[in-house]
């Protein structure tokens, strides 16, 4: 029981509550129902260029932005964020699969642009509510993972109750 709760079995946590929702709750690509911008959201302001102290890194995707994490867990720690406001990975549905795939691609590209190519030593994933520091969907791109201190190994633990990889999220959205 404790092994399952702590996610020590090495398998994705089957109790993770990220599910493929039937319809949009916060934002859905191409709908007028989406709340594209939240002035109270720091990541919305960063994406809109309203936080001049945050340097946006080159990103080839017009719907995403990328910038360095303010509390890096390793030498390379970037955040890939959709420009449209989406609360968290729990707000996603099948319509968001392409966006999540693009976020992962942008993450890999930013690492390559910064001369990091050992993708066996990379941690990419999303925090699951209520463990999100900012309520705006963001992909953590962190390398090298072998540099993690004790706390970072806990905070960014793969497929735990609080942090899931992009691959795990995509698997859940496709079901």
Swiss-Prot record:
Keyword set includes Cell membrane: no
GO CC annotation terms, alphabetical: cytoplasm; nucleus
Catalytic reaction list: adenosine 5'-phosphoramidate + H2O = AMP + NH4(+)
CDD domains registered for this protein in UniProt: aprataxin_related (cd01278)
GO molecular function: adenosine 5'-monophosphoramidase activity; identical protein binding; nucleotide binding
Keyword Iron-sulfur: no
Tissues in which the protein is found: Expressed in retinal ganglion cells.
Residue segments, region Disordered: 1-35
EC number(s) stated in the UniProt entry for this protein: 3.9.1.-
Motif Histidine triad motif, residue range(s) on this chain: 136-140
Location of the protein in the cell: Cytoplasm; Nucleus
Residue stretches making up the HIT domain: 33-144
Residues forming the catalytic site: 138 (tele-amp-histidine intermediate)
Entry-linked InterPro entries: HIT-like, HIT-like_sf
Pfam families recorded: DcpS_C
Family stated for the protein in its record: Belongs to the HINT family.
Function: Exhibits adenosine 5'-monophosphoramidase activity, hydrolyzing purine nucleotide phosphoramidates with a single phosphate group such as adenosine 5'monophosphoramidate (AMP-NH2) to yield AMP and NH2. Hydrolyzes lysyl-AMP (AMP-N-epsilon-(N-alpha-acetyl lysine methyl ester)) generated by lysine tRNA ligase.
Official protein name in the record: Adenosine 5'-monophosphoramidase HINT3
Organism: Rattus norvegicus
Record lineage: Eukaryota, Metazoa, Chordata, Craniata, Vertebrata
